[in-house]
Each structure stands twice: as C-alpha cells, then as structure tokens.
C-alpha cells in the first residue's frame, strides 16, 4: 500500500538551519544576560516579552509573529504583552529600540523582525532578541525558506528565543503523529495522522479502512511504526513517510502490539501475544530482520520504551498480580520492579533527558498522567481525571502530550502539560484524537 502524502525532506528548504547569523546580525554575547528564565526552579512566573509584528509587504509578517507568540505563551514560561500596550512602533528592526519605552510596560525581552521576498521567490526572515533592561541585543539570526514553510520559520525562531532565555533546547519545530478518530462511537474510523506540535498542518497517513493504533516516530523522523488490524489480527508495520511504502515488521505467528524504535533507529521493540494469553517482549533488528526474545514469562509484558542511551528498557508487566512498571537491560537482563504505589501502571515512556519515566496510572477510579525517577522514587501525578492516557515527551523532556476522554458522550482529545502540572493546554485537532507520539526536533 502506498500513501504518497508527505514529503519529509524539509531540511533542504532552509539554508543551514539559518544561514546562521549573517555578518550584519552578529552580536557579542554577554557572559551572563540580565534576563533569563531558570526552568529548574519549579513553578515560575512567566517572563513578560514583547513580540512586535515582523515588518513585511503583506500579512505574512503578522502571521509569523502570531505563531511565535502562541508557541512561547503555550510553554507557560512566557507572557507575551498585548500589542496595544506598545509605546514604540518599530520601523527599523535593525536599529536599537528605545529601551525605556519597553521598560515602562515591563517588557523583560523584546523581539523585532522583518520578512522580505527574495528575487528567487524565497522568503528571508530576520529577527533580533533584545534584553530591554540590560539595553543590549542578545541574538540576531536570519533564515531562508520557501513561502509554504513560513510556519516552520516561526517555530524555529520561537525555539531560538526559548533556548537563549532558558538555556534549554526548544520543542516548537516538531511534529506529532497520532490517531485521528471520526464518526459515531459505534462506527468510529481511526486513521493515522501527522501534524505540527501546535495542531496545524494535519495530514492523514492511513485511509482508515483498517484500525491502526500506537504510531511511533523513528529517531530520524522519516518512518513511523504502528499496529494495524488489517487482516483481522494486530500486526506491527513500518511506514516510510516520504514514499508511503510500508512493510510488515516480523511475520510472527501471533499478534504483535505496542511497537517502538530504539534510540539509534536500528531496532523495533514490541510485544508478541501468545496462545496462552501471555505476552512477551521481542526486538527486531531492522538491518537484518533478526528477532530476539527479551522476556519469558506467563504474564503480559508490554509497552516497552528504551532509555535515551539504549542501554535499558522500561515496560509494563502484570507478573506481580497487577500491571506495574519494570526496568531491564536492553538485552532482557536483570528485570526489576520500580513502581511501588497503589493502583495499576501502564504506557511508560523514558524522558529524552534520561532522568524521568512518564506513565499512566489507574487508581481509585481515575486515570492519571505522572512521572517518576528511573529507580521508581519521586512519583508525582501531574493530572488526574476520568480517563487520561498515553504520555509522550517533547524532545527537550520538559513537556508531555497525552490524550483525555471526558465522562459521557464524545471522544478523546489531546493535551499538553509541563512538569509542574500547572500548565495544561488542549491541542486543537479536526476530530477526536488519541495515541500521540512526539517527533525529535526537525532539521
């Protein structure tokens, strides 16, 4: 089956992730900027930031500004100031602003920029980030792209601002693969879809004729592995996003579920359901198609997720009576239980930073999204309700996306939440949505 929908070779659109910093934009970086956000302090007050409309010959500059502001505001770390409060109107984004005018409205940082169309039809996007109270430019960069990729420029600029002010990589220039759900509950159509992390640019990558679940990105963002009921029983497939070509991952005699890539993209880990009702974890080496069995139990072992360095795997098992989280070596050695709380645990996923494991917990009639340290200590529940499930990490390990279904009629919706549990946002999608998986940063 070929689905020629998505061209993922976006990296060729940009000139060196920015033709990074032309001579006219180079600035001396101070050893320590006056304005910064310490995101390791826990709950913090959002930083007031003024983002002026990028100068352009049409509406595009304003559109780019809106996306940048929305990205930063949604992170919970920034509070974009209403443009109606601006005193100075920026007419030359290359010139130093009147810092006093921005200090009056308590703008801790200021963003100015310009969009121009080049003779070859490309867009040139320039921006500068200013420390208003320090009275200095913090960064200045320029990017070239085709007009249809203007949203990517906005996300990349937002990432640059986020990184300069927090010291952490941003996560805005990313995508999410998920399950789109449409139609009545009794005849729900579930299709695989891909979108920008903010819900824009949704594209379908399966036709919905067969139930498809648990899509997961490869580390290079070019492939998705997922489970499909085509043929009647669940099997794991590999889909090439650029060509739409797909293939069966291992022609196992039983049902295969819950696939996920290894960090180097060379293996897929999954669970194989046995005739006796048990499930064990296997890996398939995508280079030579050899399979390795990692667990051998009479329990249900599933939901495997690698540590960022590929040395360990966290998974769910009911070998102790109810589903709990276990960690083992990537070769299946030394399995040990790490979850010790009441209730049942599932859908574990290791943080890209390596410090935490996110999970779904069912206890006292509620489903919660939580995190714990990799040894099981420090468990924290970030959000609880009727049904919350399926966390996935932003590539910087600071934000989670999950799906929620409210009691009663309706269907699941996607939400993000940060590690404080205080900044929860819904991601708008065309239909109901579930099973999200975040991509690495695009290139």
Curated annotation (Swiss-Prot):
PANTHER family: PROTEIN TOLB (PTHR36842:SF1), PROTEIN TOLB HOMOLOG (PTHR36842). The lineage of its organism: Bacteria, Pseudomonadati, Pseudomonadota, Alphaproteobacteria, Hyphomicrobiales. The Tol-Pal system is composed of five core proteins: the inner membrane proteins TolA, TolQ and TolR, the periplasmic protein TolB and the outer membrane protein Pal. They form a network linking the inner and outer membranes and the peptidoglycan layer. One of its GO terms (cellular component) is periplasmic space. InterPro entries: 6-blade_b-propeller_TolB-like (IPR011042), PD40 (IPR011659), Tol-Pal_TolB (IPR014167), TolB_N (IPR007195). Keywords: Cell cycle, Cell division, Periplasm, Signal. The keyword Hydrolase does not apply. This is Tol-Pal system protein TolB. Belongs to the TolB family. It comes from the Bacteria. It comes from Brucella melitensis biotype 1 (strain ATCC 23456 / CCUG 17765 / NCTC 10094 / 16M). NCBIfam families: propeller_TolB. One of its GO terms (biological process) is protein import. Part of the Tol-Pal system, which plays a role in outer membrane invagination during cell division and is important for maintaining outer membrane integrity.
């Amino acid at each position: 089956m070929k689905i020629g929908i998505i061209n993922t070779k976006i990296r060729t659109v940009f000139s060196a992730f920015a033709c990074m910093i032309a001579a006219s934009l180079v600035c001396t970086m101070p050893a320590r900027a006056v304005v910064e956000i310490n995101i390791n302090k826990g709950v913090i007050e959002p930083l007031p930031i003024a983002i002026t409309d990028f100068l352009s010959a049409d509406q595009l500059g304003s559109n780019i500004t809106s996306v940048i502001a929305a990205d930063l505001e949604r992170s919970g770390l920034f509070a974009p100031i209403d443009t109606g409060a601006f005193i100075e109107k920026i007419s030359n984004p290359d010139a130093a602003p009147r810092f006093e005018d921005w200090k009056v409205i308590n703008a801790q940082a200021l963003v100015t920029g310009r969009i121009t169309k080049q003779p070859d039809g490309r867009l040139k996007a320039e921006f500068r980030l200013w420390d208003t109270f320090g009275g200095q430019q913090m960064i200045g960069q320029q990017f070239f792209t085709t007009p249809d990729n203007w949203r990517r420029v906005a996300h990349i600029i937002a990432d640059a601002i986020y990184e300069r002010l927090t010291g952490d990589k941003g996560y805005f220039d990313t995508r999410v693969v998920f399950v789109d759900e449409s139609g009545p509950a009794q005849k729900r159509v579930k299709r695989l879809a891909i979108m920008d992390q903010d819900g824009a640019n949704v594209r379908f990558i399966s036709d919905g004729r067969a139930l498809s679940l648990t899509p997961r990105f490869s580390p290079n963002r070019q492939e998705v592995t997922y489970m499909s009921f085509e043929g009647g029983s669940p099997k794991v497939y590999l889909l090439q996003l650029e060509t739409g070509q797909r293939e069966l991952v291992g022609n196992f005699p039983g049902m295969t579920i819950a696939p996920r890539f290894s960090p180097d993209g060379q293996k897929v880990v999954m669970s194989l359901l046995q005739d006796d009702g048990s499930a064990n974890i296997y890996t398939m080496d995508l280079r030579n198609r050899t399979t390795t069995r990692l667990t051998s139990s009479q329990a249900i072992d599933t939901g495997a997720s690698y540590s960022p360095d590929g040395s360990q795997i966290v998974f769910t098992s009911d070998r102790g009576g109810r589903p709990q989280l276990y960690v083992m070596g990537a070769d299946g050695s030394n399995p040990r239980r790490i979850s010790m709380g009441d209730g049942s645990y599932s859908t574990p996923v290791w943080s890209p930073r390596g410090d935490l494991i996110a999970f779904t917990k069912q206890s006292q009639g509620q489903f919660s999204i939580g995190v714990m340290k990799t040894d099981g200590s420090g468990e924290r529940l970030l959000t609880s309700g009727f049904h919350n499930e399926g966390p996935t990490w932003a590539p910087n390990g600071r934000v989670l996306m999950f799906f929620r279904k409210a009691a009663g009629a309706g269907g699941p919706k996607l939400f993000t939440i940060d590690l404080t549990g205080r900044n929860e946002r819904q991601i708008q999608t065309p239909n109901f949505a579930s099973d999200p998986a975040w991509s690495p940063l695009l290139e």
